[in-house]
Amino acid sequence: MNKALFLCLVVLCAAVVFAAEDLQKAKHVPFKRAAICFCPGKPDRGDLWIFRGTCPGGYGYTSNCYKWPNICCYPH
């Protein structure tokens, strides 16, 4: 009985370690909370960020246009 309890504890600890590792990877993946938008003179679609004055960093945005009170950000 003692060995079975120890084995269960080892398996539980391993599961916690692997679950925590997956959560650390998930924190570094950028997640966009933007809608689709289009600006005059731009052939592609952009990302519409609601109630923002500037484009957020970390997404590779290089240009934008304002659609008050929102901003449309373009990655290329």
From Swiss-Prot:
Primary location recorded for the protein, binned into one broad class: secreted
Gene Ontology MF terms in the entry: ion channel inhibitor activity; potassium channel regulator activity; toxin activity
Keywords: Cleavage on pair of basic residues, Disulfide bond, Hypotensive agent, Ion channel impairing toxin, Nematocyst, Neurotoxin, Potassium channel impairing toxin, Secreted, Signal, Toxin, Voltage-gated potassium channel impairing toxin
Signal peptide annotation: 1-19
Gene Ontology CC annotations of this record: extracellular region; nematocyst
Compartments reported by the entry: Secreted; Nematocyst
Tissue-wise expression: Moderately expressed in the ectodermal tissue from the distal and proximal tentacles, body wall, and oral disk.
Matches recorded under Pfam families: Defensin_4
One GO-annotated biological process of the protein: regulation of blood pressure
Gene3D superfamilies: Anthopleurin-A
Disulphide linkage map: 37-72, 39-65, 55-73
Biological role stated in the UniProt entry: Blocks Kv3 voltage-gated potassium channels. Reduces blood pressure.
Stated family: Belongs to the sea anemone type 3 (BDS) potassium channel toxin family.
Name of this protein: Kappa-actitoxin-Avd4d
